[in-house]
């Protein structure tokens, strides 16, 4: 568990998966072992000794102005997915966020930077054969543009993540489609960063003269800080 402070805001990172299974050939074809070797600071945290990318699926838990905010909800348990590492998982995510002070019943906001299966999975959980919102007291915040896109899209080859992880939230009355400048607290707000998806947003955090940005999938790996054109 990693934790940072940005002024009065606390940010905690909860990792669901972290490994070298990400295919550079698909996601970042220029990130070859030879090219990565030239970026020395990537080892040992972001690249293996063999030159493979280390990537993670994680949530960020944000405490601001008395509000508990979960940013991106990872993969989830019990979800049918074509990617083997994502399929029918049985992880301890809820135990880990509870240990960080974010018991699911006490979360105030859930924010998805975009609507892809590795960012929406724990929006819901399987209860007696039904997908129900994991966070029963939370307002779920979605980019209106991203939901308009996903709502009309055919079921993805990756799995029906709209059906099992997003629509049940709207069915419960907890889902809200918002503009890309929506403000969650005085210290935390959305900013439009489309491209990876039509309505992708980043989350800006500013408090007491300090700032941070949660970029979602604006970038896929730290190597892109050194090589943005990848």
Located regions from the model:
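Metallo-beta-lactamase
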Residues: 1-102, 106-118, 125, 134-192, 210-216
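Metal-dependent phosphodiesterase/nuclease catalytic metal-binding core
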Residues: 61, 191, 201-223, 228
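Catalytic metal-binding/acid-base residues of hydrolase active sites
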Residues: 74-76, 116, 146, 194, ...
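Metal-dependent catalytic neighborhoods of phosphoester/phosphodiester hydrolases
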Residues: 82-84, 120-130
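Active-site glycine- and acidic-residue-rich loops that bind
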Residues: 120-122, 189-201
